[in-house]
């Protein structure tokens, strides 16, 4: 299937009229810089394009809650900025986004609430500011989860 065909099918599966699904697919493809992919098969998409078409499929029926797994993984910086803007606009219009990410700077920038989970256990949860304790969320994550290794044994690097 091509990207446009896929999105129309997904929209119709969610109860959209075909013409509405086509219109929304066109808008989503343009917003996510996939319009030029045209009739290219999704199976031929790059990893970043695949991530973006999956996001478009999740958005096409305008759900109240959107659950995303690493939405910025494998996308270029311009696409990541576009996706952040789309998600920000979506939440301003009343939508809720639940996402997983290993990029704490993005989480701190985008999210109002956060939970840090390690090995299936919630270590801390609350507003982003509460969890970060007024500091950097990445540093807080590292302090809670651990795993920072010393450079011992790597003294040969850079020599």
Model-derived features: positions:
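Conserved ABC ATPase "signature" region
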Residues: 8, 12, 19-37
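Conserved catalytic motifs of ABC-family nucleotide-binding domains
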Residues: 62
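Catalytic Walker B motif of ABC-type/P-loop ATPase nucleotide-binding domains
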Residues: 66-70
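Helical segment within the ABC ATPase nucleotide-binding domain
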Residues: 80-93
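A short, surface-exposed alpha-helical micro-motif characterized by mixed small hydrophobic
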Residues: 107-109
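ABC ATPase "signature
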Residues: 125-126
